[in-house]
Design a protein with these regions (language model features):
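A short Gly-Trp-Pro
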Residues: 1-114
Length: 114
């Protein structure tokens, strides 16, 4: 008999451990942020958004808003508000969180018993 995972797999703020996103909401693990690798999520929680601004990114011009932890104010990434390029429209409304700004919690090894 196999036992499943215990609890949800969550990503938390690196500074204060506030819960920010669920592993199940990852769209892509292959995004590049200012300081390295990042994940694209469909949803984020316990965050505040900065002002919308036009930003030239590797994939073109977008309107984005910085994503900050609602507890400590740490900037964790950004939210895509608008993509001008038709091929980038899938990003609209989604969140990019930088890997070094979030930590995994609740990622347990799958254990077989019996």
């Amino acid at each position: 008999m196999e036992e499943g995972l215990v609890g949800p797999r969550i990503y938390s703020c690196c500074k204060c451990r506030n819960h920010i996103a669920l592993h199940d909401d990852i769209v892509s693990k292959y995004f590049q942020a200012r300081t390295g690798r990042a994940y694209l999520f469909t949803h984020a929680m316990n965050v505040d958004l900065g002002e919308n601004e036009e930003r030239q990114l590797m994939s073109g011009l977008h309107i984005v808003a910085d994503v900050k932890c609602s507890d400590c104010g740490e900037v964790l990434g950004w939210k895509y508000e608008k993509a001008y390029n038709e091929t980038q429209k899938y990003k609209e409304g989604k969140f990019v969180l930088e890997n070094f700004k979030i930590v995994k919690e609740g990622f347990y090894e799958h254990v077989s018993s019996g």
